[in-house]
Amino acid sequence: MLPAALLRRPGLGRLVRHARAYAEAAAAPAAASGPNQMSFTFASPTQVFFNGANVRQVDVPTLTGAFGILAAHVPTLQVLRPGLVVVHAEDGTTSKYFVSSGSIAVNADSSVQLLAEEAVTLDMLDLGAAKANLEKAQAELVGTADEATRAEIQIRIEANEALVKALE
């Protein structure tokens, strides 16, 4: 909890009141209309996976940590890291996708847009190849002194570690 001295600073009180007003406004429609729907759009440069589909929940990996998104989620904009995106449909089924990177926008109207640099369903990936690529990248990292090359190899390692984790 903030000390009282901080709350008396000019401008800070307005910020706190604004946040409370938003939270109250966001909670009011949910109570009045029952469960909200979430409109989900998920695409990569080569494929559209969902276009305005009503889904129950989406789990995403971001640079600040993985989190789940439900209807009426707090608006946010996040950068995706390599990992597993899980989409929970209204009927209880789940779809799993591996994304390399991208962004996700969660809007106040319960619409969500996930734009991935690369995205594939898990059945299109090979665990053996991912493990081999991971081992190769780890071996290359040991003998590399150039910082730019080390950074590129580290990205390959991170992506392949996420692939292996998603497939195991």
Curated annotation (Swiss-Prot):
Q: Which residues carry this modification: N6-succinyllysine?
A: K136, K165
**Any GO molecular function:** proton-transporting ATP synthase activity, rotational mechanism
> Which superkingdom, per the lineage?
Eukaryota
What outcome follows a substitution of V106G?
Answer: In MC5DN5; no effect on protein abundance; decreased mitochondrial proton-transporting ATP synthase complex assembly; decreased aerobic respiration in patient cells homozygous for the mutation; partial loss of function confirmed by complementation assays
Spell out the subcellular localization from the entry: Mitochondrion; Mitochondrion inner membrane
GO terms under cellular component: mitochondrial inner membrane; mitochondrial matrix; mitochondrion; proton-transporting ATP synthase complex
Reply yes or no: does the keyword Hydrolase apply. no
Residues that the record marks as modified (N6-acetyllysine) are: K136, K165
Enumerate the InterPro entries for this protein: ATP_F1_dsu/esu_C_sf, ATP_synth_F1_dsu/esu, ATP_synth_F1_dsu/esu_N, ATPD_C_metazoa, ATPsynth_dsu/esu_N
- This protein's transit peptide sits at 1-22
| GO biological process per UniProt | aerobic respiration; mitochondrial proton-transporting ATP synthase complex assembly; proton motive force-driven ATP synthesis; proton motive force-driven mitochondrial ATP synthesis; response to copper ion
* Effect caused by changing P82L: In MC5DN5; no effect on protein abundance; decreased mitochondrial proton-transporting ATP synthase complex assembly; decreased aerobic respiration in patient cells homozygous for the mutation; partial loss of function confirmed by complementation assays
Q: Which family does it belong to?
A: Belongs to the ATPase epsilon chain family.
**HAMAP family (UniProt xref):** ATP_synth_epsil_bac
Task of the protein: Subunit delta, of the mitochondrial membrane ATP synthase complex (F(1)F(0) ATP synthase or Complex V) that produces ATP from ADP in the presence of a proton gradient across the membrane which is generated by electron transport complexes of the respiratory chain. ATP synthase complex consist of a soluble F(1) head domain - the catalytic core - and a membrane F(1) domain - the membrane proton channel. These two domains are linked by a central stalk rotating inside the F(1) region and a stationary peripheral stalk.
How does this protein assemble? Component of the ATP synthase complex composed at least of ATP5F1A/subunit alpha, ATP5F1B/subunit beta, ATP5MC1/subunit c (homooctomer), MT-ATP6/subunit a, MT-ATP8/subunit 8, ATP5ME/subunit e, ATP5MF/subunit f, ATP5MG/subunit g, ATP5MK/subunit k, ATP5MJ/subunit j, ATP5F1C/subunit gamma, ATP5F1D/subunit delta, ATP5F1E/subunit epsilon, ATP5PF/subunit F6, ATP5PB/subunit b, ATP5PD/subunit d, ATP5PO/subunit OSCP.
Per the UniProt record, the associated disease is: Mitochondrial complex V deficiency, nuclear type 5: A mitochondrial disorder characterized by childhood onset of episodic metabolic decompensation featuring lactic acidosis and hyperammonemia accompanied by ketoacidosis or hypoglycemia. Chronic manifestations include developmental delay, easy fatiguability, and 3-methylglutaconic aciduria. The transmission pattern of MC5DN5 is consistent with autosomal recessive inheritance.
Annotated protein name in UniProt: ATP synthase F(1) complex subunit delta, mitochondrial
